[in-house]
């Protein structure tokens, strides 16, 4: 990384402290990935059982019930995906957008691919009976949706993986998306994800198809015990394979992000997963003797949830460690750039036209901190300098303005047309001292005065 140019970070304050954003990122990602797993796993199992149903009709009815869940889990996966996407944009703006830029057209293809996948999912669900005599067509529709659900996470995973390794960006830029896909740890991580999706869905279907309110009589060839055995097995087998896939992921991870704390989280997850495997095996053995869901099922669900949280936390710890030096250098580059800008403003080259606003006290503060979102006369993200000056041109306007800058609680209401779509980030005394804020207020009052 020492030989690569480091882009300057964006000199804007975060809306929350970085550790708080990291916790939010992990929490929201866990919620998102649970429903992504159920969406992908449900799609794969629905198609699998529909194919098996060609010879045994009972499997077709089972596949239909599974397919009904996918449109629900799909919607929840999309809604819950917004939060972690925003959080990672805030925490890792430069790495994330750099990776997006490198993967380019393939990255943006996620949007049309998701759209087509969702349309195929609805088509597969709502043509079940209409295409009952054309199973080849119907299965093809479901298989195409499943294939897209497999491709989309692959693209996303490859992109998020790339952002962690700035030293590989030039290689990826020259080699294209194929170079990104075939980085050593992408395919093992993808296998780990797909196995988790099938295991999670198997456990979900144990509850969905054998709970007290489930209409088991819709499956004449099945009983609660047989369904429970089948889907505990669906959950157990990929979980066992994870004990091979997990170490493969760890072995192929570049050491740049490894830390003792991250490995401790992984170790705890492995131990707990082994306990879950034991419990699922006992549930399979005792299924014939337990007509209802046992208490052990909920122990399994809770333990699996803790495993997911531990794995997601380990993932974030690895990312933070891998990008620690890059982030620090990027912030330093931003500081150096602001120093150069300030020097240029204070010492303009000979013959350079002078900005007439330079002589107004407070203009330099406005230019450095506000101009990205507030135009002088035009609304950008927030209201213009003229509008703000008119609003705070009262005897107590300076104090009210300081309150707004410090707390984002605006004591003066803008007109609807000038109302910003989001709250402005607060500026503490460490960012703008009292004199700078009051000087900024004076500048706004000055530019708001009617000109002769």
Mark where each language-model region is.
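Electrostatic cytochrome c docking/interface patches
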Residues: 337-365
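Membrane-interface interhelical loops and short amphipathic "cap" helices
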Residues: 2-29, 56-62, 86-106, 159-190, ...
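Hydrophobic cores of alpha-helical transmembrane segments in multi-pass inner/ER membrane proteins
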Residues: 36-46, 108-125, 191-208, 268-283
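Internal/C-terminal transmembrane anchor helices
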Residues: 290-319
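Membrane-interface helix-loop-helix modules in multi-pass inner-membrane proteins
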Residues: 73-141, 244-274
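Gly/Gly-Pro-rich "capping" loops immediately C-terminal to redox-active cysteine motifs
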Residues: 375-407
């Amino acid at each position: 990384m020492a030989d690569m140019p480091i882009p300057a970070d964006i000199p804007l304050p975060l809306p929350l402290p970085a550790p708080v954003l990291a916790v939010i990122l992990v929490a929201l990602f866990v919620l998102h990935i649970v429903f992504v797993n159920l969406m992908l796993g449900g799609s794969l199992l629905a198609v699998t059982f529909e194919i098996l149903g060609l010879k045994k009709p009972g499997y077709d009815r089972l596949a239909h019930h599974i397919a009904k869940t996918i449109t629900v889990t799909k919607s929840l996966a999309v809604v819950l995906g917004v939060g972690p996407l925003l959080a990672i944009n805030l925490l890792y703006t430069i790495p994330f957008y750099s990776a997006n830029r490198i993967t380019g057209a393939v990255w943006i293809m996620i949007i049309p691919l998701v759209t087509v996948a969702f349309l195929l999912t609805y088509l597969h669900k709502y043509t079940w009976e209409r295409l009952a005599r054309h199973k080849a067509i119907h299965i093809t529709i479901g298989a195409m949706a499943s294939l897209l659900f497999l491709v989309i996470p692959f693209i996303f995973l490859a992109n998020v993986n790339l952002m962690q390794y700035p030293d590989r960006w030039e290689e990826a830029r020259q080699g294209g998306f194929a170079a990104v896909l075939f980085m050593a740890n992408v395919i093992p991580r993808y296998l780990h994800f797909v196995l988790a999706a099938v295991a999670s869905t198997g456990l979900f279907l144990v509850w969905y198809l054998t709970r007290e309110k489930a209409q088991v009589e819709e499956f004449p060839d099945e009983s609660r015990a047989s369904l429970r055995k089948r889907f505990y097995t669906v959950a157990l087998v990929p979980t066992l394979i994870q004990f091979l896939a997990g170490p493969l992921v760890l072995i192929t991870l570049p050491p740049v992000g490894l830390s003792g704390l991250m490995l401790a989280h992984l170790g705890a997850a492995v131990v707990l997963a082994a306990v879950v495997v034991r419990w699922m095996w006992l549930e399979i053995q005792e299924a014939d003797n337990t007509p209802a869901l046992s208490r052990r099922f909920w122990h399994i669900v809770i333990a699996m949830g803790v495993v997911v949280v531990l794995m997601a936390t380990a993932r974030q710890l690895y990312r933070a460690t891998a990008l620690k030096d890059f982030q620090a250098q990027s912030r330093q580059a931003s500081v150096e750039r602001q120093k150069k800008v300030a020097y240029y403003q204070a010492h303009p080259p000979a013959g350079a036209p002078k900005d007439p606003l330079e002589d107004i006290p407070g203009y330099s503060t406005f230019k450095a901190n506000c101009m990205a979102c507030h135009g002088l006369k035009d609304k950008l993200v927030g209201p213009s300098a003229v509008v703000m000056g008119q609003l705070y041109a009262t005897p107590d306007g300076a104090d009210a303005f300081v309150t707004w800058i410090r707390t984002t609680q605006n004591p003066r209401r803008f007109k609807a047309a000038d109302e910003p779509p989001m709250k402005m980030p607060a500026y503490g005394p460490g960012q703008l001292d009292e004199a700078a804020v009051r000087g900024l207020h004076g500048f706004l009052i000055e530019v708001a005065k009617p000109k002769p």
